[in-house]
Amino acid sequence: QVRLLLPGEVLRFDLSQERPRLCQRQRLATAPASEEDSLDEQLGETLERCRQTFRPCALLVSGGVDSNLLGSYLDPQLQRFHLCLEGDEESLLPHPRLQRFELRQEAFMPLLRRAVGNFGGATRMSSLLMYQRLADGIGEQGYHCVLLGEGADELFWGYPRHLELWRRRDAPEPRRFAAAWFGEYRRKAALLAEPAGRRVAERIEELAHEALGQGLEAAIGQFDLHYSLEPLLRRADHLLMSRTIEARTPYLHGALAQRAGRLQRIVGDTAKAPLVALLEQREKRWQAQPKRHFRLPFERWPQALGEMRRHLAERLPALHDLGLEGLDAPSVAALPGDQLFTLTTLSLWQQEYGASL
């Protein structure tokens, strides 16, 4: 029997016998964060709790705000890991214990097949491949616990869509709101046989309309949770756990979500303003950089694009069987990298799990 633990629930086991025995179930009352506690103090306390483990712990770092802010609280001797993409390297703050893992185009298809198998589904997140490479590298170094900056962009509004929606202040019509998360979803849905394609687009707009009925801020929170944060966490969990690595997410603990909602998250043209201000205060070497999305640089990876086009061209009959009747050789030759990736993961998923379908 599988029973989910509630937040704040503690189980105590007697390990003196051959088989562990549950001897106490306790629910800890968590006091709400004091308004007197600064964001600095609250994040530091949350990070300290997330670090509590008997295993060596490391931090995944990029050149962005979230991981660098976490790193400003940590011992300089704590291991840092970073993923370098061929043709798209990122500038990082110097650190004595920084190890880089490289991801090259030549590894694309074999690694993607493994990543799709571990993830267990099709996805548009090209970072799937990046997390598989990170998991392999971290696992080879013997680490089984890593700290991630996931959740900061959703809670503190760090994406370009947040700036765009907040500048207008008025609730947009459902199509424009949905496009902020799903892009040109009607064009993409046109690859499906009718009436499925039309129904998909209509359902997306129904969900956007229902969310906007709660107000713009609540709608953003709802779509961020279900269509951004949850998929990203599932990606991190499945790919890292393929190498028995636990992912810990300090920004999602310690009532930081409630505090984020009470702060002015966008100031002028600065997204994620409270975190940016805190990082500038704590890390004097930090210099603001344009937002970089954690995704593959398909515009610089022609070899990967070619591999996906060849794979899809060979798999057209199987994809037609899945309902993608609008997909043909000319469209495969013209599709952009992000859509090629989504369709390739669908094809690989069908190959990996076809016997069970």
Describe the residue ranges of each PLM region.
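ATP-dependent adenylate-handling ligase core
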Residues: E86-I138, F156-D170, G213-G215, R262-I266
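Mid-to-C-terminal catalytic subdomains of enzymes
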Residues: Y143-A171, G215-L324
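Glycine-rich phosphate-binding loop signature in dinucleotide/nucleotide-binding domains
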Residues: Q52-F54, I138-Y143
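Active-site-adjacent "lid"/gating segments
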Residues: Q1-L59, N68-H95, Q99-R114
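Conserved phosphoryl-transfer catalytic core
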Residues: E164-E184
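Conserved G/P- and acidic residue-centered "switch" motifs that form tight phosphate/ATP-binding loops
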Residues: G64
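Peripheral terminal appendages
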Residues: V2, E9, D14-R19, E36-A58, ...
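Structural motif
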Residues: G121-M125, R167, A211-D224, D269-T270, ...
